[in-house]
Curated annotation (Swiss-Prot):
Catalytic reaction annotation: XMP + diphosphate = xanthine + 5-phospho-alpha-D-ribose 1-diphosphate
Protein name as it appears in the record: Xanthine phosphoribosyltransferase
GO biological process: purine ribonucleoside salvage; xanthine metabolic process; XMP salvage
Keywords: Cytoplasm, Glycosyltransferase, Purine salvage, Transferase
Annotated organism of origin: Streptococcus pneumoniae (strain Taiwan19F-14)
Length: 193
Protein backbone atom coordinates (compact mmCIF):
# COMPACT_ATOMS: atom_id res chain seq x y z
CA UNK A 1 0.00 0.00 0.00
CA UNK A 2 1.87 2.99 -1.30
CA UNK A 3 0.12 5.48 0.98
CA UNK A 4 1.31 3.53 4.03
CA UNK A 5 4.84 3.02 2.69
CA UNK A 6 5.14 6.75 1.99
CA UNK A 7 4.00 7.54 5.53
CA UNK A 8 6.53 5.10 6.99
CA UNK A 9 9.32 6.74 4.99
CA UNK A 10 8.18 10.21 6.07
CA UNK A 11 7.42 9.65 9.76
CA UNK A 12 8.90 6.29 10.77
CA UNK A 13 12.04 6.16 12.89
CA UNK A 14 14.42 3.21 13.04
CA UNK A 15 15.57 2.19 16.51
CA UNK A 16 18.47 -0.25 16.63
CA UNK A 17 18.63 -3.14 14.19
CA UNK A 18 15.01 -4.26 14.07
CA UNK A 19 12.52 -1.77 15.51
CA UNK A 20 10.50 0.74 13.51
CA UNK A 21 8.85 3.47 15.58
CA UNK A 22 5.60 4.72 14.03
CA UNK A 23 4.11 6.43 17.05
CA UNK A 24 3.11 9.56 15.14
CA UNK A 25 0.41 7.75 13.16
CA UNK A 26 -0.18 4.20 14.48
CA UNK A 27 1.22 3.10 17.84
CA UNK A 28 0.56 6.18 20.00
CA UNK A 29 -1.05 9.00 18.04
CA UNK A 30 -3.49 7.72 15.42
CA UNK A 31 -4.01 9.20 11.97
CA UNK A 32 -7.67 8.29 11.54
CA UNK A 33 -7.75 9.11 7.81
CA UNK A 34 -4.86 6.70 7.17
CA UNK A 35 -6.51 4.07 9.39
CA UNK A 36 -9.77 4.50 7.48
CA UNK A 37 -7.93 3.84 4.19
CA UNK A 38 -6.23 0.80 5.73
CA UNK A 39 -9.62 -0.48 6.90
CA UNK A 40 -11.10 -0.02 3.42
CA UNK A 41 -8.23 -1.92 1.80
CA UNK A 42 -8.57 -4.87 4.19
CA UNK A 43 -12.38 -4.85 3.80
CA UNK A 44 -12.15 -4.87 -0.01
CA UNK A 45 -9.67 -7.75 0.04
CA UNK A 46 -11.76 -9.87 2.41
CA UNK A 47 -15.27 -8.82 1.29
CA UNK A 48 -16.01 -12.26 -0.19
CA UNK A 49 -14.65 -14.23 2.80
CA UNK A 50 -17.86 -14.05 4.84
CA UNK A 51 -16.12 -12.36 7.78
CA UNK A 52 -18.39 -12.08 10.83
CA UNK A 53 -15.89 -10.67 13.36
CA UNK A 54 -12.62 -8.74 13.32
CA UNK A 55 -10.26 -9.60 16.20
CA UNK A 56 -7.13 -7.81 17.38
CA UNK A 57 -5.04 -7.39 20.51
CA UNK A 58 -4.81 -4.20 22.53
CA UNK A 59 -3.59 -1.56 22.08
CA UNK A 60 -2.11 -0.55 18.72
CA UNK A 61 -4.12 -3.06 16.71
CA UNK A 62 -7.39 -1.42 17.74
CA UNK A 63 -7.34 1.51 15.30
CA UNK A 64 -6.81 -0.48 12.08
CA UNK A 65 -9.14 -3.22 13.35
CA UNK A 66 -12.02 -0.89 14.16
CA UNK A 67 -11.86 0.79 10.74
CA UNK A 68 -11.69 -2.63 9.06
CA UNK A 69 -14.70 -3.82 11.05
CA UNK A 70 -16.57 -0.63 10.19
CA UNK A 71 -15.88 -1.12 6.47
CA UNK A 72 -17.02 -4.77 6.71
CA UNK A 73 -19.99 -3.80 8.92
CA UNK A 74 -19.13 -6.43 11.55
CA UNK A 75 -18.20 -6.25 15.25
CA UNK A 76 -14.58 -5.82 16.35
CA UNK A 77 -13.24 -7.59 19.43
CA UNK A 78 -9.92 -6.82 21.08
CA UNK A 79 -8.08 -9.22 23.35
CA UNK A 80 -7.23 -7.63 26.69
CA UNK A 81 -3.75 -7.90 28.16
CA UNK A 82 -4.75 -7.10 31.74
CA UNK A 83 -7.10 -9.05 33.97
CA UNK A 84 -10.37 -7.23 34.46
CA UNK A 85 -12.73 -7.93 37.38
CA UNK A 86 -15.75 -7.57 35.11
CA UNK A 87 -14.51 -10.46 32.96
CA UNK A 88 -15.11 -13.29 35.38
CA UNK A 89 -16.68 -16.18 33.48
CA UNK A 90 -16.32 -17.85 30.11
CA UNK A 91 -12.95 -16.25 29.46
CA UNK A 92 -10.76 -17.57 26.64
CA UNK A 93 -7.03 -17.00 27.20
CA UNK A 94 -3.62 -17.50 25.61
CA UNK A 95 -0.03 -16.59 26.40
CA UNK A 96 1.50 -14.00 24.07
CA UNK A 97 5.13 -12.88 23.96
CA UNK A 98 5.68 -9.27 22.88
CA UNK A 99 8.81 -8.80 20.80
CA UNK A 100 8.82 -5.03 21.37
CA UNK A 101 8.12 -5.10 25.11
CA UNK A 102 10.06 -8.33 25.77
CA UNK A 103 7.34 -9.67 28.11
CA UNK A 104 4.80 -12.50 28.08
CA UNK A 105 1.18 -11.55 28.78
CA UNK A 106 -1.97 -13.56 29.26
CA UNK A 107 -4.47 -12.14 26.79
CA UNK A 108 -8.18 -12.78 27.03
CA UNK A 109 -11.49 -12.44 25.24
CA UNK A 110 -14.92 -13.10 26.75
CA UNK A 111 -16.13 -16.31 25.14
CA UNK A 112 -19.64 -14.92 24.68
CA UNK A 113 -18.36 -12.73 21.83
CA UNK A 114 -17.16 -15.64 19.65
CA UNK A 115 -19.12 -18.66 18.43
CA UNK A 116 -18.45 -21.69 16.23
CA UNK A 117 -20.31 -19.93 13.40
CA UNK A 118 -17.88 -17.00 13.36
CA UNK A 119 -15.45 -16.45 10.50
CA UNK A 120 -12.73 -14.25 11.90
CA UNK A 121 -10.30 -11.81 10.34
CA UNK A 122 -7.36 -11.04 12.62
CA UNK A 123 -5.96 -7.52 12.18
CA UNK A 124 -2.77 -6.30 13.86
CA UNK A 125 -0.42 -3.36 13.62
CA UNK A 126 2.84 -5.32 13.32
CA UNK A 127 3.92 -8.85 12.46
CA UNK A 128 7.37 -9.76 13.77
CA UNK A 129 7.68 -13.26 15.23
CA UNK A 130 3.97 -14.08 14.94
CA UNK A 131 3.32 -14.59 18.62
CA UNK A 132 0.42 -12.12 18.93
CA UNK A 133 -1.38 -13.68 15.96
CA UNK A 134 -0.64 -17.17 17.28
CA UNK A 135 -2.20 -16.28 20.65
CA UNK A 136 -5.28 -14.81 18.97
CA UNK A 137 -5.61 -17.95 16.83
CA UNK A 138 -5.56 -20.09 19.99
CA UNK A 139 -8.34 -18.00 21.56
CA UNK A 140 -10.46 -18.01 18.40
CA UNK A 141 -10.09 -21.77 18.02
CA UNK A 142 -10.97 -22.32 21.71
CA UNK A 143 -14.34 -20.77 20.81
CA UNK A 144 -14.70 -23.13 17.84
CA UNK A 145 -14.59 -20.20 15.43
CA UNK A 146 -12.58 -20.18 12.20
CA UNK A 147 -9.68 -17.89 11.34
CA UNK A 148 -10.20 -16.88 7.71
CA UNK A 149 -7.09 -14.71 7.34
CA UNK A 150 -4.65 -12.39 9.07
CA UNK A 151 -4.29 -8.77 7.99
CA UNK A 152 -1.13 -6.94 9.02
CA UNK A 153 -0.45 -3.23 8.70
CA UNK A 154 3.38 -3.49 8.85
CA UNK A 155 5.26 -6.78 8.49
CA UNK A 156 8.89 -7.22 9.47
CA UNK A 157 9.72 -9.67 6.68
CA UNK A 158 13.20 -10.22 8.11
CA UNK A 159 11.59 -12.03 11.06
CA UNK A 160 9.85 -15.40 10.88
CA UNK A 161 6.24 -14.52 11.81
CA UNK A 162 4.80 -14.82 8.31
CA UNK A 163 6.46 -18.20 7.69
CA UNK A 164 5.20 -19.52 11.03
CA UNK A 165 1.60 -18.50 10.27
CA UNK A 166 1.54 -19.58 6.62
CA UNK A 167 3.10 -22.97 7.43
CA UNK A 168 0.25 -23.44 9.93
CA UNK A 169 -2.22 -22.77 7.09
CA UNK A 170 -3.26 -19.18 7.79
CA UNK A 171 -3.25 -16.71 4.88
CA UNK A 172 -1.39 -13.48 5.68
CA UNK A 173 -1.96 -10.16 3.92
CA UNK A 174 0.47 -7.34 4.76
CA UNK A 175 0.04 -3.77 3.55
CA UNK A 176 3.71 -2.81 4.06
CA UNK A 177 6.54 -5.35 4.21
CA UNK A 178 9.87 -4.27 5.64
CA UNK A 179 12.76 -6.12 4.02
CA UNK A 180 15.55 -4.52 6.05
CA UNK A 181 16.96 -1.33 7.48
CA UNK A 182 19.92 0.01 5.54
CA UNK A 183 21.90 3.20 6.21
CA UNK A 184 19.15 4.48 8.49
CA UNK A 185 16.44 3.91 5.87
CA UNK A 186 13.61 1.41 5.49
CA UNK A 187 13.93 -0.91 2.49
CA UNK A 188 10.59 -2.42 1.51
CA UNK A 189 9.84 -5.84 0.15
CA UNK A 190 6.99 -6.03 -2.35
CA UNK A 191 3.76 -5.78 -0.37
CA UNK A 192 0.77 -8.08 -0.83
CA UNK A 193 -1.29 -5.14 -2.16
Amino acid sequence: MKLLEDRILKDGHILGDNILKVDSFLTHQVDFSLMREIGKVFAEKFAAAGITKVVTIEASGIAPAVFTAEALNVPMIFAKKAKNITMNEGILTAQVYSFTKQVTSTVSIAGKFLSPEDKVLIIDDFLANGQAAKGLIQIIEQAGATVQAIGIVIEKSFQDGRDLLEKAGYPVLSLARLDRFENGQVVFKEADL
